[in-house]
Amino acid sequence: MVKAVAVLSSSEGVSGTIFFSQEAEGAPTTVTGDLSGLKPGPHGFHVHALGDTTNGCMSTGPHYNPHGKDHGAPDDEHRHAGDLGNVTVGEDGTAKFTIVDKQIPLIGAQSIIGRAVVVHADPDDLGKGGHELSKTTGNAGGRVACGIIGLQG
């Protein structure tokens, strides 16, 4: 069992903690999270390529995409590995969620440890919105909070 954690923060008052666990190599990764300080509704949620927050969330690079695919929904065959869809925020500005995904391993050459997780301002259109950004970012808007995924003991 490998575990990881990302503590999210932002200059806009958004905060949260995201936990990751993977039982064994080849097994899916379970992601559980708690977020607060967001506007109600769906928000794009992605693993980005870089664990660099020297310029806030802007320096985390593009969505993690080791196979060079177009942006898509979490259940699409062709998608960025880091495309985790949306998290839904309640009227109180908080979200609690669990995601199980096979494309974001903690073990092996394509591990997401050391990369960043990012919450976006707007809903992810899952690559199906017809906007010029749909196939690259899901047209999910600005980056409102992020954290580096680190190994947990």
Swiss-Prot record:
Q: How is the cofactor bound?
A: Binds 1 copper ion per subunit.
Keyword set, alphabetical order: Antioxidant, Copper, Cytoplasm, Disulfide bond, Metal-binding, Oxidoreductase, Zinc
Q: Does the keyword Disulfide bond apply?
A: yes
Q: Which residues bind Zn(2+)?
A: 63, 71, 80, 83
Q: List the GO terms this entry assigns under cellular component, sorted alphabetically.
A: cytoplasm
* The reaction(s) this protein catalyses: 2 superoxide + 2 H(+) = H2O2 + O2
- Location of this chain's protein in the cell: Cytoplasm
Q: Which cysteines share a disulfide bond?
A: 57-146
- Give the residues annotated as coiled coil: none
Q: What class of enzyme is it?
A: oxidoreductase
Q: Name one GO molecular function term.
A: superoxide dismutase activity
One Pfam annotation, family name? Sod_Cu
Required co-factor(s) are:
Cu cation; Zn(2+)
> Where does the chain bind Cu cation?
46, 48, 63, 120
EC numbers on record: 1.15.1.1
The stretch of residues making up the signal peptide is none
User: Which purpose does this protein serve, as stated in its record?
Assistant: Destroys radicals which are normally produced within the cells and which are toxic to biological systems.
Subunit relationships: Homodimer.
Similarity-based family:
Belongs to the Cu-Zn superoxide dismutase family.
Please report the name of this protein according to its UniProt entry.
Superoxide dismutase [Cu-Zn]
